[in-house]
């Protein structure tokens, strides 16, 4: 007899992509309508800008389906506007919004997207846009491909995170790509992430590139801390990815709970001191794939910064977000788009 998913925490978050994908191409600024095809290999030149020079951007979205009602797609308009920012930063043609939403909806409508390689009520959606031109030199691509992949997601309570404070490498510098969701933002992470895992940590804590003192992000998650009576999160700048989960948490905290949310720089020194004097009571991360997760510890060279284990604010915010996504609470801010599953 198989255990319910919640009791199998050793299973990975994802296994593989759903069997079908959506695809559209852009020639000279004209996009084809989205087509459906078997998820798999595409004919692509190895010199394509997307492969050779990292001209590639993506999104990560989420949808819920209870198996009966229409599927609930979360904040797709926000994902589209971030995709526009990312494409523009890399000088790429942007898929029109209608095409983008249609391709995502097609994926959700297909019941097999939710059932293979394993059945799930939550679908992770990965739109990708990449340059197809195969120039010898790094020139922005005129021919561009847009694909929408999906993958069923496993949800169950996960262990609090242990973060490795990265004092040598940096994620993003001022004027760089940190605020755009580009593949290039991930290329530099493999080595630091591997080192963090070697040190027994789950993820990298990224600090600012200039001083390595200010907290920016945790791997691919935004960061929140409860300090005194305030929910504090690093202020957005071009070195920080503007997470949609981050934004949703801020809205929930402010508008539903009247909690004061402050966006400002947070240093590691302040965090260590605020834990010491008892004013820092909670720390957690926010992202689409991992949703909201607590931080247990930051390993910073020889010292360990340990966080309190009780997380009442985090628990409340996570429940609120989950209830909206699942249709168990009012969609007060119009975050949900319903898509019938055929
Ligand atoms: C995608 C991403 C996030 C989280 O953003 P969400 O919109 O909440 O999923 C945070 N940091 C980085 C670097 C990311 O790529």
What do the predicted segments below correspond to?
Residues 1-107, 134-342:
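Helix-start/capping segments and mature chain N-termini
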Residues 5, 116-130:
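Extended, Lys/Arg-enriched charged tracts that mediate electrostatic binding to polyanionic substrates
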Residues 19, 111-112, 127-132:
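Active-site loop/lid in soluble adenylation, ligation, and acyl-transfer enzymes
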Residues 99-122:
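Non-catalytic accessory segments adjacent to catalytic cores
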């Amino acid at each position: 007899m198989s255990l319910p998913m919640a009791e199998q925490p050793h299973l990975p978050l994802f296994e593989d992509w759903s069997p079908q994908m959506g695809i559209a191409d852009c020639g000279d600024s004209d996009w084809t309508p989205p087509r459906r095809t078997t998820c798999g290999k595409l004919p692509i030149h190895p010199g394509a800008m997307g492969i050779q020079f990292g001209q590639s951007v993506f999104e990560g979205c989420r949808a819920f389906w209870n198996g009966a009602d229409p599927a609930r797609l979360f904040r797709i308009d926000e994902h589209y506007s971030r995709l526009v920012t990312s494409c523009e930063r890399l000088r790429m043609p942007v898929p029109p919004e209608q095409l983008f939403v249609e391709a995502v909806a097609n994926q959700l409508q297909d019941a097999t997207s939710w059932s293979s390689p394993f059945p799930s009520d939550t679908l992770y959606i990965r739109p990708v846009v990449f340059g197809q031109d195969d120039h010898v030199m790094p020139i922005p691509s005129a021919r561009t491909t847009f694909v929408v992949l999906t993958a069923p997601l496993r949800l169950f309570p996960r262990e609090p995170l242990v973060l490795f404070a990265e004092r040598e490498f940096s994620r993003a510098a001022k004027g760089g790509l940190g605020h755009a969701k580009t593949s290039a933002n991930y290329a530099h992470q493999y080595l630091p992430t591997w080192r963090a895992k070697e040190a027994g940590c789950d993820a990298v804590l990224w600090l600012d590139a200039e001083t390595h003192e200010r907290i920016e992000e945790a791997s691919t998650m935004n960061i929140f801390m409860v300090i005194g009576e305030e929910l504090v999160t690093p202020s957005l700048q071009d070195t920080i990815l503007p997470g949609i989960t981050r934004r949703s948490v801020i809205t929930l905290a402010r508008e539903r709970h009247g909690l004061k949310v402050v966006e400002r720089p947070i240093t590691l020194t302040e965090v260590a001191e605020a834990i010491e004097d008892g004013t820092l009571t909670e720390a957690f991360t926010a992202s689409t794939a991992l949703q909201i997760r607590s931080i247990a510890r930051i390993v910073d060279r020889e010292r360990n910064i340990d966080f309190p284990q009780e997380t009442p604010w985090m628990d409340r915010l996570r429940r609120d977000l989950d209830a909206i996504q699942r249709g168990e609470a009012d969609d007060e801010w119009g975050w949900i788009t319903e898509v019938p599953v055929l």
